Amino acid sequence: MRENGFPAPKFSTTIPKGDDRARAVCDHCGFIDYQNPKIVVGSVALWKEKILLCRRAIEPRKGFWTLPAGYLELGESVEEGARRAAWEEARARINIDRLLAVYSVPRISQVQLMFRATLESENIDAGPESAEVDLFDWDGVPWADIAFPTVGWALRQWRESRGFTEFPPYSNPVEGL
């Protein structure tokens, strides 16, 4: 018994009726603790054709460059989450243009949504998870030091979508993960 008078939950792993995979199920009340993918939201944000990148100050891939992105919080829209991530990582205010891509990263149970965006100003500064932030023209992107495959995909797909106002969202390239 816990201090609040409720029994401490005890879970067993079983396949619930009508399901096709093992889940953690409460032995007392039958509650099913579904483990679902995490949603990551971010942006390819520009200031006058220069791309905002953040050098990671944390693991994984500390010291490598990434786009401003982060986990979606409860109660946020995906657009709100992308704006918050840009602020937290680069102290950048962004205007979302449109959805650029949706990536599936099953090996780490993530779904990533990347937006095309513009910076409201060139005033940027490293947030607590960034060692530094900078604006890069296309030829100056530090390709050898990009943190994750999805960052490279988003950058290339942003470039491919330039000049288009309507296009279906991109997804994982054929080579996948």
Region spans (language model):
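Surface loops and adjacent helix of pleckstrin homology
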Residues: 38, 56, 146
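Unchanged
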Residues: 72-157, 161-167, 175-177
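Acidic, metal-coordinating catalytic segment for phosphate/diphosphate chemistry
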Residues: 2-42
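Short, low-complexity, intrinsically disordered N-terminal peptides in bacterial proteins
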Residues: 1-6, 173-177
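Well-ordered beta-strand scaffold positions
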Residues: 31, 49-50, 92
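Short connector loops at helix/strand junctions that flank enzyme active sites
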Residues: 21, 36-40, 46, 60-62, ...
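Conserved hydrophobic/aromatic beta-strand scaffold that supports enzyme active sites
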Residues: 23, 44, 53, 114-116, ...
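Conserved Nudix-box catalytic region and its N-terminal flanking loop in Nudix hydrolases
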Residues: 46-88
